[in-house]
């Protein structure tokens, strides 16, 4: 057991040192404060799919006016038009101009539809960031290590592509999937040695298993590349501060692992834009309150 723990620590250290020198703004040390010993600063982004009925220009305007620092742009999941529109109409220079106009940073492309390869060059030329995708089908507990190793081996070409385009690939946990449980998170971080690969943690799916979100955050550690502030409730109650989950322990855990990305309030469902904006404003304020409460222990 001690050897396994030492191995995990060494692998995590390798991931940290490998990523530190090449990390784009999406995962930069800006999230860690002015110095290694400084207080962790929470940064907020949100996803364009929340405004999928609007153009990408209008979505960026809404997100910026709400005070978010960065954006996660979605491909065609549930018909979201934004990323394909950027690819076909704006291109990397047009996207950079649009984001600069609204003083937004590019955090991520969510590529559940289309895959990373399709958007890798665009992401790199737009400044680099995180590409979020799923894992693979579930497996029996006794098969977990072998299946995770095979899955990560299969991602090596994508990790090389991410390095070429100064980007990162974050694998999201999901119900009924390979990456779904605390044990699967442990297997991922133990086996993964690429600084280009990490985890996109969706607490919604952690909660469905009645597992601890702070524990999941701490297991992921420096391999946590994307964090959804997202709870297991229906409708708008999936959002922070709208649903009942106390996310202060989540924020404290993010600070403990010195999470380098943005905290991304999220929900599935597509209310009218003004309703969505009002709920995201509640989430923004709520997360800031959580950070304030947690900061005593940060």
Language-model region placement:
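Structural motif corresponding to the early beta-alpha repeats
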Residues: 69-158, 163-168, 205, 235, ...
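Conserved, mostly hydrophobic/aromatic
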Residues: 46, 63, 71, 99, ...
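N-terminal secretory signal peptides and thylakoid transit peptides that target proteins
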Residues: 1-18
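C-terminal helical cap(s) of enzyme catalytic domains, especially alpha/beta-barrels
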Residues: 276-292
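C-terminal segment of N-terminal export signals and the immediately downstream linker at the start
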Residues: 25-54, 58-62
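Charged helix-capping and loop-helix junction motifs
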Residues: 86-93, 144-155, 183, 212-216, ...
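Short, acidic/polar
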Residues: 53-63, 114-123, 211-216
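Acidic/histidine-rich catalytic cores of soluble enzymes
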Residues: 70, 160-252
């Amino acid at each position: 057991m001690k050897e396994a723990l030492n191995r995990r620590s060494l692998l995590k250290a390798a991931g940290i040192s490998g990523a530190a020198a090449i990390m784009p703004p999406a995962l930069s040390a800006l999230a860690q404060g002015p110095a290694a010993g400084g207080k962790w600063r929470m940064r907020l982004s949100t996803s364009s799919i929340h405004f999928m009925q609007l153009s990408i220009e209008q979505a960026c305007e809404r997100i910026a006016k709400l005070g978010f620092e960065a954006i996660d742009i979605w491909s065609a999941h549930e018909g979201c038009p934004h990323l394909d529109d950027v690819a076909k109409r704006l291109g990397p220079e047009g996207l950079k101009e649009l984001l600069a106009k609204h003083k937004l940073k590019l955090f991520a492309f969510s590529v559940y539809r289309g895959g990373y390869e399709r958007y890798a060059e665009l992401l790199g030329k737009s400044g680099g960031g995180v590409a979020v995708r799923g894992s693979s089908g579930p497996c029996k507990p006794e098969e977990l290590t072998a299946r995770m190793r095979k899955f990560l081996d299969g991602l090596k070409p994508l990790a090389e592509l991410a390095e070429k385009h100064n980007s990162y690939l974050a694998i999201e946990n999901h119900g009924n999937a390979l990456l779904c449980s605390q044990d699967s998170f442990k297997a991922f971080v133990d086996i993964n040695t690429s600084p280009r690969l990490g985890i996109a943690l969706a607490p919604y799916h952690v909660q469905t298993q009645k597992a601890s979100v702070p524990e999941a955050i701490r297991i992921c550690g420096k391999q946590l590349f994307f964090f959804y502030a997202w709870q297991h409730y229906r409708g708008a109650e999936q959002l922070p501060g709208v649903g009942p989950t106390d996310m202060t322990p989540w924020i404290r855990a993010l600070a403990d692992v010195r999470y380098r990305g943005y905290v991304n309030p999220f929900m599935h469902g597509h209310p009218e834009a003004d309703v969505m904006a009002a709920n995201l404003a509640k989430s923004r304020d709520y997360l800031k309150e959580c950070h304030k409460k947690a900061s005593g222990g940060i």
